[in-house]
Amino acid sequence: MNPIVINRLQRKLGYTFQQQELLLQALTHRSASSKHNERLEFLGDSILSFVIANELYRRFPRVDEGDMSRMRATLVRGNTLAEMAREFDLGECLRLGPGELKSGGFRRESILADTVEALIGGIFLDSDIHTIERLILAWYHSRLEEISPGDKQKDPKTRLQEYLQGRHLPLPSYLVVQVRGEAHDQEFTIHCQVSGLNEPVIGTGSSRRKAEQAAAEQALKQLELE
């Protein structure tokens, strides 16, 4: 891999790996090698959830568990992680197999999000919990400053349903129109039909649930509720 690209990524992350093989593994999708990033992703997912939960607990001493859970879900969900990946220009660093390269896997939100979690796992193994906690909080600084408890933190499907129910309109319908990829790495495409919108709204995700949430979020934007 191009060392210039790797060094640029490490500068954006604010961390230089001592064990460069951990960085390369974190950037490797299972389509490219048997030594891929899924175990690191598993580890990073748990670390991210802990760090964000701990920070929310510290910042919001009077907020109940339900609101904190919703805020955490907003901060660690796939599209937030994919946004962060794009801020790091992570797409140009991914190691993908020929099929994923051809299908534009370097742009796919699920792959970008998973790679951020794998990087978190890799940095933890390369350093310690205090280092990765400091980095995560730095990456999330603006998002943590902006987030607040309340209805805004409900997931998109819930907010869309409550909006329609409040106006006595039919509930949205979700239809799977395409499933791509192998069983371990699928991408679902959903059409969501919503009263008040002329065309179905499209959402994609690595599971049906995530695709439905993505479609609901697009519907909320079209209804100008986002």
Swiss-Prot record:
An annotated GO cellular component: cytoplasm
One term of GO molecular function: double-stranded RNA binding
Origin: domain of life: Bacteria
Keyword check for Cytoplasm: yes
Stored PANTHER family: RIBONUCLEASE 3 (PTHR11207:SF0), RIBONUCLEASE III (PTHR11207)
Task of the protein: Digests double-stranded RNA. Involved in the processing of primary rRNA transcript to yield the immediate precursors to the large and small rRNAs (23S and 16S). Processes some mRNAs, and tRNAs when they are encoded in the rRNA operon. Processes pre-crRNA and tracrRNA of type II CRISPR loci if present in the organism.
UniProt name for this protein: Ribonuclease 3
Species this chain originates from: Yersinia enterocolitica serotype O:8 / biotype 1B (strain NCTC 13174 / 8081)
Gene that produces this protein: rnc
